[in-house]
Design a protein with these regions (language model features):
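Divalent metal-dependent catalytic cores for phosphoryl transfer on phosphate-bearing substrates
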Residues: 10-16, 38-160
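Long, amphipathic alpha-helical surface segments
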Residues: 156-172
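Acidic/histidine-enriched, glycine/proline-rich intrinsically disordered or flexible terminal extensions
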Residues: 178-188
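Conserved small/polar residues in nucleotide/adenosyl-binding loops
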Residues: 189-195
Length: 201
């Protein structure tokens, strides 16, 4: 089935998101597109996933919880304590039901863009990292270096960003989703393997 028109999605996001979130969304979408070209991923899928990754971000926590309960979307302990984390899960649901996305890889990229998951697909890695390095981000440690490495060795950049994320959460005594920790731990194992994702030469 044909995926939804990107122009329509962009107009919908401009309407649904606040200005700051919309600018971030554009940054993620275009960064994802750049990484997709670098690593040979599908360009349109990267743009759609990037454009929709935060489509539920501006919903209230109450609304996100309501959607999860109404449509039997599971809520884990970390999400119960921090309902804002539900925006990825709800966003993936809305991408399918409201915006007409049918590609499972796009839906998974939206679903896992906050926590990551072990054995992410190329598109999932691209969207996760694009959310971290897009031009509007300013304060993450070693950000210029991670941005540079992202276009040379995707897995290495992913590890660096995951390390920073876990360090930030631990330093602030904040809840760490078990999936993020698993993603980091397994990525450390896989990074030494010959399947590391490097730019197309």
């Amino acid at each position: 089935m044909k995926e939804p028109d990107l122009k329509k999605i962009r107009k919908a996001m401009e309407k649904e998101l606040d200005p700051k979130r919309y600018e971030h969304t554009l940054g993620v979408a275009y960064t994802a597109a750049s990484l997709a070209m670098c690593y040979g991923a599908d360009l349109n899928s990267a743009l759609i996933a990037g454009m929709l990754h935060d489509c539920a971000k501006c919903l209230s926590n109450e609304k996100k919880i309501s959607i999860c309960k109404k449509h039997d979307l599971p809520i884990n302990p970390a999400e119960e304590k921090n309902p804002f984390l539900l925006h990825a899960k709800v966003g993936s649901y809305l991408a399918s039901k409201k915006y007409g996305v049918t590609d499972p890889d796009i839906l998974n990229a939206i679903l896992n863009h906050t926590t990551g998951r072990p054995d992410m697909s190329l598109l999932e890695k691209i969207v996760w990292l694009s959310d971290y390095i897009e031009p509007g981000r300013k304060q993450a440690p070693n950000l210029p270096e991670i941005r540079r490495i992202a276009f040379e060795d995707l897995d290495k950049a992913l590890i660096m960003a995951l390390e920073n994320t876990l360090s930030y959460l631990k330093g602030g005594n904040m809840e760490i989703d078990s999936m993020t920790q698993k993603t980091y731990d397994l990525s450390l194992i896989h990074i030494s393997e010959p399947t590391r994702l490097r730019r197309i030469s």
